[in-house]
Amino acid sequence: MNAISLVQGDITTAHVDAIVNAANPRMLGGGGVDGAIHRAAGPALINACYAVDDVDGIRCPFGDARITEAGNLNARYVIHAVGPIYDKFADPKTVLESAYQRSLDLALANHCQSVALPAISCGVYGYPPQEAAEVAMAVCQRPEYAALDMRFYLFSEEMLSIWQHALTQH
C-alpha cells in the first residue's frame, strides 16, 4: 500500500521535497491555496513562474503541471497543477486525474521522496469534494507512486473526513 497520510492544516507549513499548488493556467497566484502558497513563498516563486514559457499567457494547461523552485517554503520545489473548472469540462474526472498524475510524475522525475498535496479543484473551481477525493486516491494508489510519501493537506475538518473516507475505500 502506498504511503498516503492526511493532515488538517496549512500546506504552506509542510516540510517536504515538493508542495503541489492548485494553480491556475497563468501560474501567477490567485485565491485559496494558490494565493497562500505564493504569499508564503515570497517573490522568488512569482519570479520562477514568470520564467516558465507561456503561450498567450498560459504557462500550464488544464490537467498538466509545471515545477519551479519553492522560494521561502520548507520545500525544494513547488509543483503547479492545474485541475479542471468542474462545470466547464465535459469530462472533469480525466482532467483532474491528469493533474494529479503529472504532479506525481514531476515529483519522481525530480528525485522527490515526499510531496504535500491539496484538494485540487475543490475551491473556486467547484469540484465536488467526494468525487475529487476518489480521483485523488485512485491516482495516488497506483504502483508507480509507491516510492512517494504523499501527504494531503486539507483545510477543514469536513474535507479531512471526506478524504479519510475515500482513503479507506481504496
UniProtKB/Swiss-Prot annotation:
InterPro entries: Macro_dom, Macro_dom-like. SUPFAM superfamilies: Macro domain-like (SSF52949). CDD domains: Macro_OAADPr_deacetylase. Residues 1-170 form the Macro domain. Signal peptide: none annotated. Belongs to the MacroD-type family. This is Macro domain-containing protein VPA0103.
